[in-house]
């Protein structure tokens, strides 16, 4: 399955929140993301991602292990994705480190998730702030077979426009790259 997704900077956060709230109740959550790579950085250099994410909400906590293959749609950055829930993230962290993977970067995301249907597709819209980065972002995604990617991307684009997001606000920059660049510019590891 492919995560058909677009990400954009949000210029008018309150208007976008209101437009999303008209479609669905939002759920606040905190993501703690840790990305891993091989010693030679082969995963990231090939556009692959291996992430351990712990999501904390008012309803509890859960952790997911996600592997993403290289981008198949360069305009959006959409990638094939494989994800599973894990019971104990510390065990997975130990397992990955034991297999000689290293932590590439870890960071926190503060999110509000909205689930709704648009043009017959189940969508997840996430308003995101990363404490280390300036601004607010929106991610809008749906999971589809590769054969439906083009149609799904059009629904995602149209829905973003309906939410007040202009095409010029779209970005393919990854949070991992932005956080690493911010830390480097600040002299942090």
Task: State where each predicted segment sits.
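N-terminal strand-loop-strand beta-hairpin
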Residues: 1-120, 157, 165-189
């Amino acid at each position: 399955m492919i995560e058909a997704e677009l990400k954009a900077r949000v210029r008018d956060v309150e208007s976008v929140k209101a437009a999303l709230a008209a479609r669905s109740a939002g759920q606040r959550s905190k993501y703690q993301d840790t990305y891993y790579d091989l010693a030679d950085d082969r995963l990231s250099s090939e556009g692959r991602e291996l992430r351990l994410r712990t999501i904390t909400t008012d309803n509890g906590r859960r952790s997911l292990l996600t592997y993403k293959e290289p981008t198949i749609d360069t305009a959006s950055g959409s990638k094939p994705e494989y994800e599973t829930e894990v019971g104990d993230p510390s065990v997975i962290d130990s397992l990955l480190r034991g297999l000689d993977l290293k932590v590439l970067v870890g960071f926190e995301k503060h999110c509000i998730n909205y689930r709704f249907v648009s043009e017959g597709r189940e969508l997840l819209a996430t308003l995101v702030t990363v404490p280390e980065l300036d601004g607010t972002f929106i991610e809008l995604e749906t999971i589809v077979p590769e054969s439906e990617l083009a149609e799904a991307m059009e629904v995602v684009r149209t829905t973003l426009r309906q939410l007040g997001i202009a095409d010029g606000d779209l970005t393919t920059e990854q949070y991992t790259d932005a956080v690493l660049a911010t830390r480097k510019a600040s002299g942090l590891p």
